[in-house]
């Protein structure tokens, strides 16, 4: 027997379904305008803006027991790499917008901790979304997909009781899990670990009861950086740390990503310097040299050219601390950690006795195919502004609320693949230029961006002459970036042809 409950009649939290043996005696169905799958940062940002700008009803189904997505399982010492001012949802501030007075982020705006972020998302759910009377929240529940016989009915079940329930969706199902964020605690390492080798995730570092004779951090992304900084902050001598770094990365300077009007002048200078660097460069190598000379990109070692770019952000002081670690292993990815050796893609190196290995190799934001964001009865949340996931989700909700035609929505909301290689800095920058140029044509979009707390890009409020100059600069930069990428592709093609001919 299936019963339907009107949205306004049901409780905000799903009541357990009574089961008899293996048969569900009553399968509940609710009806809403939107189903959002995932209560992580993107799902919450989308829901917040949608509720603010429409009268829609929403169901949120999430596999975790509290809002926050990957933050619920992240290592306890993780912090945002960029200011709290740009994170969360539009309707509620995160943090106090204070400037840190001490530590390795001193002089820069505060970075929320995982505890702060989890508390924040809980408050968003409990004090904003649920009190609206238009949100139904299903924690510890799994989304099973559409009912084959009824495409508008989405099937779900509780991960605790096993009880099944249906959600009839009048408008769209929103996939807020597509970006597939992972942290080390979510998955085992992709390399073999011999018996007796001590390997932990960063989550276990604060639970250490005795020091290790040596520490080896495996992985060089944001998590690897955090693990190295944590060890240094807790007094580990740099000589006691080995850092296995499959690729060096170009890093962003956090000082250049600061909120508030006091940063306006430096923002303008940075933007001008970036455009100048692009326009004056004739090769990709020259461009990165200019970007580094202008302080727009940073690297760990001056004698190693980075081949990766993944939006990792550091302060100059943090970078100085990381440079104290001199035992850096650059021989590709780990294949096997044995008792006496570590086998990597490019070499086998000796292992120090008593080493504690810290696995930081989870992909974070893996490369996902770009798909149309708006398609029939589905919305697939993806990054629009590179490396700004929550703004992208909130922006997508605004577009959904404001425009009627999917073709127009997809023209405005062109997703960007998450950057991976150094060349992706060029691709991401060209993508952002293209987006901003599209948005220039719609004053309403620019004004919405200006009002959003989730982005630095305040363009709509610029005087006409400055906006015109910016428009021209973006056009020129995009064209030059495309030419540099085409030149790089041609260079690679020639090198491959020469190699083939030589064989």
Question: What are these regions, as identified by a protein language model?
Answer:
Residues 4-33, 52-56, 180-206, 495, ...:
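Extreme N-terminal leader/targeting segments of oxidoreductases
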Residues 32-59, 224-232:
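N-terminal Rossmann-like FAD-binding beta1-loop-alpha1 element of flavoenzymes
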Residues 37, 166-181, 216-218, 353-363:
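Short hydrophobic core segments
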Residues 63-120, 244-301:
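Glycine-rich active-site loop/strand segments that organize a redox cofactor
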Residues 68, 229, 328-331, 335-469:
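Glycine-enriched catalytic-core subsegment of oxygenase/oxidase enzymes
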Residues 101-183, 311, 318-344:
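Feature captures the FAD/FMN-dependent oxidoreductase FAD-binding
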Residues 107, 113, 117-120, 172-235, ...:
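Glycine-rich dinucleotide-binding loop and its adjacent helix/turn
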Residues 294-295, 299-367, 462-503:
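C-terminal catalytic lobe of FAD-dependent flavoproteins
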